[in-house]
Amino acid sequence: MDLELKGKTVFITGSTAGIGFATAKALLSEGASVVLNGRTPASVTTAVKKLEQEFPNESVSGIAADFSLPKEVNSLLENLPKIDILINNVGVYSSGSFFETEDAAWYRQFEVNVMSGVRLSKSLLPRMLTTNWGRILFISSECASLTPPDLIPYSMTKAAVLAVSRGLAQLTKGTDVTVNSVIPGSTLSEGAEQFLEDAAQKEQKTKDQIESAFFTEVRTTSLLQRFAKVEEVAHTITYLASPRSSATNGAAIKVDGVSSGGLF
C-alpha cells in the first residue's frame, strides 16, 4: 500500500533512538522527508548519517534541542522548515519513591513530555489549519493508565498528553487536519534491552527467561507476552501520519497487546 507520504515533511522529537528513530526509518521508506531531533548535536549528527546511508535517495536532516530549556526550544521553532506532520515523541522519566521525588523531577518531566508538544502544536497547527492538511501525533504510554508506583510523575505526563491530543483534535473539526495519540505498551527499546541484560546478569538467567517472567508476573494481561518491537510501533505511527488515516481523528490508538487492560 502506498501511504501517499511523498512530498510530506515530518518533524519527530526525540528521534535519535528507539521508537522515534524506527519511525523515521519507516517514514523515509515511504518517501517522506524527515527532520530528526535529539538533545545534543552529536547524537543528531550520528542518527542523520545512519539514515543517509540507509536511504541515500531520501531527504533527512536534524535539529538539536533540549526541550527542558525554553531558549533552545525557541531557537528550534525559528529554524524549523515547513512541517506537514508533527510527531511528539520526546520523553524523559525518572524512577523512584513518590515520597522522595523532588518537585524539580516533576517539573522537568512535565516540561519535556507535555510542554514540548504543546509549544510545537501551538506553532505548527495554525498553518496546518490554513492549508487544510496536517497530522499531529502524541506518543503516550501504557503508564498513562497502569501508573506504576515508581513512575507516578512520568505516568502523569503520559496521561496529560492524551488530554492535550484530544483537545487539539476538537480544533480541527471539519478540516483535513487530524490529531491523534498512540499508546505503546512495553517496547523493546534500547532502555528495555539494557533492563533485560542487567536483570539477566543479576539473576543469572537468560534474557528470554527474564522477558517471560516479566509478562507472566508483571504484565499479566498482555496478549503478546513479549515486548513489542520498535518497528511494530513505528508502523502504526506511520499509518496515522499518512493521508490514508483521514477518518481517524481524536483517537488514542493502543499498540500494547492489551497490556494496559480495559475493554477499549
Labelled PLM ranges:
Residues 146, 237-238, 245, 249-264:
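Short C-terminal tail/terminal secondary-structure segment
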Residues 9, 16-18:
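Conserved glycine-rich cofactor-binding loop
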Residues 126, 170-171, 246:
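Alpha-helical segment proximal to the catalytic Tyr-Lys
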Residues 173, 178, 248-250:
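Short, small/polar-rich loop/turn modules that mediate ligand/substrate recognition or access, typified
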